[in-house]
Amino acid sequence: MSRTRTSGTVLSQRALNRALLARQHLLGRRKASAEKEIEHLVGMQAQVPNSPYVGLWTRLEGFQPNELAELINTRRAVRLGLMRNTIHLVTARDCLAQRSLYQPLFDRAWQTSSFGRNLVGIDVSAVIAQATVFMKERPRTFSELGRLLQQRWPDRDTTALAYAVRYLLPIVQVPPRGIWGKSAQPTWTSAEFWLGRPVATKSSHDKLVLRYLAAFGRPPLATSRPGRD
């Protein structure tokens, strides 16, 4: 059996496994609010809309789906692209505090993507500004947003125009997407508009790493460098 040596202590694979499960609150259900649990986990994978409900039910004593649904409906929790630009569920506080930490990662992904190459030669900041206006009118699907933007940039691909917004602007999916027992197309708006507060322009990598360590333990180096890997 392979072992890891840390500060003179030999940890078995089972000990490491138990430590991870304990950090993840998976050794037994505990009494806590869904909001506090989401923050402890530094967000929850939500690419599949109902997966956070299962994750919270697994961890929390007496959890009911309407508790999370209420957090989403009252804008205390939101769904947005974060780690690896996949959809995560986070509290409103963490959305506003963390989103800027991942922007360098999104910028590099955009520059090397086919979507980014399609928009070479135009002012992408103007695309973002126009998209913000459209989303303030009402939340939009990406297909709708792409068609609206193409009216101004008719020689550009609608998907590339819409994905510029996904990569370069903090946006959130709005309910009923993500509500237990309901289904809807992903519909988006500005995080700042939805939450009524600005996204932080400067946040602490160190604080995020410490929270990650509390929830997951020691990660690979690249994982501990959000926005830089």
Locate predicted features.
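Long, low-complexity intrinsically disordered regions
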Residues: 1-229
